[in-house]
Amino acid sequence: MARAVRAGILGASGMTGGELLRILASHPGVEVEWATSREYAGKPVHTAHPHLRGFYTGLKYTSIDKIDIGEVDVVFNALPHGVGASIVAEAYENGVRVVDLSADYRLRDQSLYPKLYGFKHPRPDLLEEAIYALPEIYGEKLRGARLAAVPGCNATAAILAAAPLVASKIIDMDVGIIVDVKAASSEAGSKPSRHSIHPLREGSARPYTPWGHRHAAEAVQVLRDLVGRGIRLSLVPHAVSMTRGVLASAHALLRDNIGFSEAVRAYASFYKDSQIVRVKPMAPGLPVDPPDVKNVIGSMFAEVGFAVEEESGRITGFAAIDNLVRGAAGQAVYAMNAMLGFDEWEGLRSPPLRP
């Protein structure tokens, strides 16, 4: 029997790091060699993640300055944006595969980083090397890749909702797409803030960064790859009262003489090979439930749907995902599987939780 792949996790005490540990605990081909945390260094993994008590019994958090990058086969970077970019580059240069869950290698245009993330990228030469880890579009490129950039959760949902519209060219590209996103509180991470604490988040719904969310740049980059031209896209997220999940609604104007039947073909064709996207067309008289985050929680599944408003000539694409699994740790494990030659769904076959 071949030895297990040795993995290291940078930033393993946050919500994304915890979800990554949860998924890897059931992966038969991976052993976590080290997991870093500044706050919990020297303490067991379950100190930060009590639901993992009984797993990783011999593993304690370590500080970044004590890790040996070269002793692992793959590094997952779950550190805050900008913090781990140089460590990722070091791992890459030492022949270690890297799966980056931060935004540090998602965008190929280095000029966007100061504007969107507040730092000058330390290794712009590696931006073109990173494969954007969205299986439905870049799955083939992930196989054997050395550096994978895990999409943002809002970007994942936005792209899944809008990609069939763009790829099929059934919408007016010059008018563009407006994406409305409903985002759960876990998207804000484990550190409490003025707007993320329960008394202020529960029962609330509010927009945030409506003047140009960072994840819009990811969506534009991917949609441009699909059609080979620029596209206008606005993404406005809303903080809503749920713990997990993202629901994206992508609004666009159909081209003349395009209707429901063309939309059915567009979505069916785009997702025909996907094992984890459930396509749910919506129209009067169709006995189909709409995409719902409740149907995908805890899983890699995405529910995608669309509706056509004949009177206005508009179409809305929808996508519901779990922000911590499909929008983060699950896509990271999928990328690792593809990069290292595992079955791509190893460790990811769990059905969703409901209710």
Swiss-Prot record:
What's the encoding gene here? Answer: lysY
Official protein name in the record: Putative [LysW]-L-2-aminoadipate/[LysW]-L-glutamate phosphate reductase
- Enzyme class, broadest EC rank: oxidoreductase
Taxonomic superkingdom = Archaea
Q: What is its EC number?
A: 1.2.1.103, 1.2.1.106
- Primary site of residence: cytoplasm
- Reactions that this protein is recorded to catalyse: [amino-group carrier protein]-C-terminal-N-(1-carboxy-5-oxopentan-1-yl)-L-glutamine + phosphate + NADP(+) = [amino-group carrier protein]-C-terminal-N-(1-carboxy-5-phosphooxy-5-oxopentan-1-yl)-L-glutamine + NADPH + H(+); [amino-group carrier protein]-C-terminal-gamma-(L-glutamyl-5-semialdehyde)-L-glutamate + phosphate + NADP(+) = [amino-group carrier protein]-C-terminal-gamma-(5-phospho-L-glutamyl)-L-glutamate + NADPH + H(+)
The coiled-coil regions, if any, are: none
Q: Where is the active site?
A: C153
- What's this chain's function? Involved in both the arginine and lysine biosynthetic pathways.
Supply one GO molecular-function term. Answer: NADP+ binding
Q: Belongs to which family?
A: Belongs to the NAGSA dehydrogenase family. Type 1 subfamily. LysY sub-subfamily.
Q: What is the lineage of its organism?
A: Archaea, Thermoproteota, Thermoprotei, Desulfurococcales, Desulfurococcaceae
In the record, biological process GO terms are: arginine biosynthetic process via ornithine; L-arginine biosynthetic process; lysine biosynthetic process via aminoadipic acid
SMART domains, alphabetized: Semialdhyde_dh
As for subcellular location, the record says: Cytoplasm
This protein's GO cellular component annotations are: cytoplasm
Pathway-wise, it operates in: Amino-acid biosynthesis; L-lysine biosynthesis via AAA pathway; L-lysine from L-alpha-aminoadipate (Thermus route): step 3/5; Amino-acid biosynthesis; L-arginine biosynthesis
Report keywords, A-Z: Amino-acid biosynthesis, Arginine biosynthesis, Cytoplasm, Lysine biosynthesis, NADP, Oxidoreductase
Gene3D superfamilies named among the record's database cross-references: Dihydrodipicolinate Reductase, domain 2, NAD(P)-binding Rossmann-like Domain
Binding site residues for NADP(+) = S13, G14, M15, T16, N323
